Amino acid sequence: MKQKCVLIITDGIGYNKNSKFNAFEAAKKPSYEKLFKEIPNSLLKTSGLAVGLPEGQMGNSEVGHMCIGSGRTIYQNLVRINKVIENKELEKNENLQKLLAKCKRVHIIGLYSDGGVHSMDTHFKAMLEICAKNGNEVFAHAITDGRDVSPKSGLNFIKDLKEFCENLGVHFATLCGRFYAMDRDKRWDRVKEYYECLLGKAYKVPNLLEYLQKSYDENVTDEFIKAAQNENYKGMREEDGIIFINFRNDRMKQLVEVLNSKDFKEFEREKIFENLLTMSVYDDKFKLPVLFEKEKIENTLAQVISKAGLSQLHTAETEKYAHVTFFFNGGKEELLENETRVLIPSPKVKTYDEKPQMSAFEVCDAVKKGIEKGEDFIVVNFANGDMVGHTGDFNAAIKAVEAVDTCLGEIIECAKKHDYAFIITSDHGNCEAMQDEKGNLLTNHTTFDVFVFVQAKGVSKIKDNMGLSNIAASVLKILDLEIPKEMNEALF
């Protein structure tokens, strides 16, 4: 069976038997049609317990790539944090106790929704409650979502938070959309707007809930809400404590850098803050206290390939680069021996419906070069189905799928020419459900299964009831390497 192998992750493309508002079904996709007819294929689970999330919880790119790259189900931070809160153990956390003892005033920052991808509203409320009951003066800074949940769901979430704050005697200080507060593509002008808001230098309003409704009236939805502050909020002081409740790291790193890094030079800052506490490890370089330390994940797919002395290429465009490197490698940033990484810049557009092909063709070229160079293993992510799916633009999502389909055709042809095996799958669904039955836009991930295709010597059938955690062992089987005991079985 020994063959070199390409693993293609088509982000945000899932299987939905309902063809209505299904961008995957509506797209012209000759490469996929050929795959369905000629290549062994099946469906994989990408949500809930299958990927270490609560039952019924939609999967996401972080969880999906970690599951694929580690070859096992890892209980995610969401599940770990839920358990600690349920057992009343969060308030006993040593780092939290230290911060609350040191700082009289405490600011809680995070994405406020029940999306469960970056954060959870219940975690935000639990933290507010712990800090308030401890006697600290507490300020809530809510980031509106509209991406992992529906675009105007924020009104109910923020109403809930406002009432919760009033009942607790907590200040509801600021409101801002994740487009600004949670940028991850070094668009520092966006983060600067949020930084100014936290310092008390933003647009002042008497009622943040009314401000949100007014934004809707002006066709500005949750993700894009401009930073605003309650008129009574005077800003953060340098001696204040700041707690970040997002458990996913990639969209909080830039904000933490702006608030805390002494070496930051992207724009002038009036204040730098020292007393920060993050829910999880956002970046090892920050050297900040955290509430939940990283779980060590050993013998990942990338590690096994590296230890065997084989070469590997990891490539994606900016939006998904962390997923094929940090997350795929089990939460490790450092480069492995014989591992090459190729980052293709994502296009500089406001939202990706403006350019649905994104940088797919450049990513495709990087893969073909890797095959021609003879890399033993290649993992690639095509971001289009997910990133364009998040915009809610159905026609743009169709074009996104068509761009991915074109790239698949080129990679498959190149792989066959050089006798490479390939596995094609997705980390989760998105673009296969762009509207609900009432016509509301769906910008979030789905809980649908995803396709998997395997073209390799001797493979004619894929086992039933498999998941993302079965892919790593499949790659190792194709490469003729020993499968470590930590991994789940192969797909075939």
Residue ranges and their predicted role:
Residues 1-492:
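Feature captures the catalytic ectodomains and active-site-proximal regions of enzymes
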